Amino acid sequence: RMRSNKAMINRRNLSGFVHALKAGEAVWFAPDQDYGSKGSVFAPFFSVKKAATTNGTYALSKLAGAPLITLSMIRRSDKKGYHMYISNPLSGYPGEGKVAAAAYMNKIIEREILRAPEQYLWMHRRFKTRPEGEVSLYK
């Protein structure tokens, strides 16, 4: 990973992300991962009404004030490279509050997945964190 990146920032180092953004650096992280209940809210994601969704995107937007874009790579049908999709800066984000921001971001992620759903990493346990008292979706 380091070969093509300037640096790696630990996902728990929010101030490192904010500092890099305020210095004009581009940062990337995966908001579609389940990072656990701490630092997450529950928002709809496809047909799952309560998917743990990171507050990291919301926090970075509020603290750094940097524009957000999406970047998706879709494997070419000839398997010789990728098509890269880079969005315009997202408008209307973060909206009002963490849950609204998470729902907005999940809709964006859904849109990107639907470009080529067969290429999404469905095997990762995106829904492992559940609201207290709710049963696992993997049993």
Feature map (PLM): residue ranges:
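Membrane-interfacial amphipathic helices and adjacent loop/beta segments
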Residues: 1-12
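Non-catalytic C-terminal accessory region of glycerolipid acyltransferases
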Residues: 11-139
